[in-house]
A protein has these predicted regions:
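Structural recognition of the beta-strand scaffold that forms the well-ordered cores
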Residues: 63-67, 154-159, 186-189, 227-230, ...
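Active-site-adjacent substrate-binding region
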Residues: 119-133, 137, 145, 149, ...
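Solvent-exposed loop/turn segments at secondary-structure junctions
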Residues: 31-33, 70-73, 161-165, 193-194, ...
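Soluble metallo-hydrolase cores and metallopeptidase-like ectodomains found primarily
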Residues: 15-50, 174-256, 268-271, 275-281
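Noncatalytic luminal/extracellular "stalk/propeptide" segments of secretory-pathway proteins
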Residues: 1-120
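Acidic/histidine-rich catalytic neighborhood of metal-dependent amide-processing enzymes
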Residues: 143, 147, 223-226, 249-349
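Surface-exposed loop and adjacent secondary-structure segments within mature catalytic domains
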Residues: 75, 79-112, 159-190, 202, ...
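Protein/peptide-recognition domains central to ubiquitin and immune signaling
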Residues: 1-20, 135, 145, 153-178, ...
């Protein structure tokens, strides 16, 4: 019998040049059912080395199953979409332990497998050390795919451990590096489809799978581009308030909640300020970033070019002229407050700015930092960069990096509220007598010591 499988190719996957049918081979990358060691670079590298040694010369012409069976979760009793109530917002305001610098080396090779310890370490790492870790992590993954390509595999099937099942999360092979080799066709299947193929194989039924991946690589322009525009200020036009969101997204959906929603909110806030012809003492600059999903590349590059080197901490003249940066990238929900990034000096200022917005549900300030988006590029060099607290809706449960990230999950009312709040914050920052207070400029990073590691290829 024949049955369809639900899947999607990973970004920068190779193509098939038409339909390809082949037998499957089961070659799991990790020894256990829960590959927690995937998060640790040293362990991942060792697993890839072991995989290459064990499978060299054995996989030609096969469609390779890389993952073990994925247990599909019983549907949770928690709602798939939520809004913050007063209790949840109050929980966010509870004090957390301040970041205590942990011992780390650069380049970082290992992280704790225990989640709390790992999260604590990641919170203390300088942004450049953290992003360097994930870049090298991507390169180790890519070395696996390059090996499989060199072995002549017909394709690779995987699944993903996020979500309750039934949803596709297809991200990257890591092949976006300009010096990367071409990966084979790599597809992510829903857990149900993947498990079905693997069970047939385990029962000795020798299933055959047909895949057809149409992929074109264009290397004529390897650059990403930020989109930047300004509303000129008046008396202090050389000082700048920035707002922004990232323009890139993953491909299995349309990127509606991550992060077309943030771009739409930023653009609408910019339009409001322009249409109302409000007086602006400082210049207002909007930036829609590229390459956020590959490591905040657009915003990190912009900060390095205009404000400061995040390694040496050598500042440029513009560093002293940035009044603040406001980022929108937590889905399509209403704005409920601000993460202060441990900059308690802005609390009384933001409290005053939020007072007329309380009837819109903007009530909460938390001293906590939040991770994973472009305000970190500014915060990393001592600039006031902030991300808003937003109603979760179904962002983390269903749409984040998934095939469900479509227009249907971006409520217009939430986006309009967020745009009004963002416009108000930017207007206040542009006209405040003083610029926003800053945390101290971080110290320069120590010299990076490249490890003497052999390639796993």
């Amino acid at each position: 019998m024949a049955a369809p499988l639900r899947g999607y190719p990973r970004a920068w996957s190779g193509g098939t040049s038409g339909p390809v049918t082949a037998e499957v081979a089961f070659a799991p990358l990790f020894p256990g059912p829960d590959p927690i060691e995937f998060l640790d670079l040293a362990r991942l590298r060792k697993n890839v080395e072991n995989f290459i040694q064990a499978n060299r010369g054995k996989l030609k012409g096969k469609i390779v199953l890389l993952d073990r069976l994925r247990e599909v979760e019983v549907p949770s009793k928690e709602p798939l979409a939520t809004r913050y109530d007063d209790a949840k917002l109050a929980e966010l305001t509870k004090d957390v332990e301040p970041r205590v610098p942990a011992h780390w080396t650069w380049p970082l090779e290992s992280v704790p497998l225990e989640k709390e310890e790992r999260d604590a370490l990641m919170r203390t790492l300088p942004l450049e050390v953290r992003e360097d870790f994930w870049e090298r992590h991507q390169r180790v993954q890519l070395s696996l795919y390059e090996f499989l390509r060199s072995e002549g595999v017909a394709g690779v099937l995987m699944t993903d451990r996020r979500g309750p099942g039934g949803i596709l999360f297809a991200e990257s092979t890591g092949g976006f590096f300009t010096d990367a080799g071409l990966p084979p066709p790599v597809l992510v299947l829903t857990p149900e489809s993947y498990n079905r193929v693997l069970r047939l194989f385990e029962h000795g039924l020798n299933p055959r799978v047909t895949i057809d991946v149409q992929a074109t690589f264009d290397s004529s322009d390897p650059h990403g581009y930020n989109v930047v525009a300004e509303l000129p200020g008046s008396k202090k036009r050389d000082e700048v308030v920035m707002l922004g969101a990232h323009l890139d997204s993953w491909h299995s959906g349309t990127g509606a909640t991550d992060n077309a929603a943030g771009c739409a909110v930023a653009l609408e806030a910019f339009r409001i300020l322009k249409a109302l012809k409000l007086p602006l003492t400082r210049t207002v600059r909007i930036a829609l970033w590229s390459g956020e999903e590959q490591g905040l590349l657009g915003s990190r590059g912009y900060v390095r070019e205009h404000f400061a080197d995040p390694v040496t901490m050598k500042t440029q003249a513009e560093h002293a002229k940035l009044a603040g940066y406001f980022n929108v990238d937590n889905g399509a929900g209403k704005i409920r407050g601000v993460y202060l990034q441990e900059n308690g000096m802005v609390r009384p200022i933001f409290e005053a700015w939020m007072a007329p917005l309380r009837d819109l549900g903007v009530t909460t300030l938390t001293n906590r930092d939040t991770e994973g988006t472009d305000h970190l590029s500014f915060d990393a060099v001592g600039l006031p960069g902030f991300q808003f607290i937003q109603d979760p809706l179904d962002y983390r449960s269903r749409t984040h990096h998934s095939e469900l990230d479509t227009f249907d999950h971006a409520p217009a009312g939430d986006l309009l509220q967020a745009a009004a709040v963002l416009a108000s914050f930017v207007y206040d920052a542009a006209n405040r007598p003083e610029m926003l207070p800053r945390k101290p400029l971080p110290p320069a990073l120590p010299p990076k010591r490249e490890p003497s590691l052999s390639s796993p290829r």
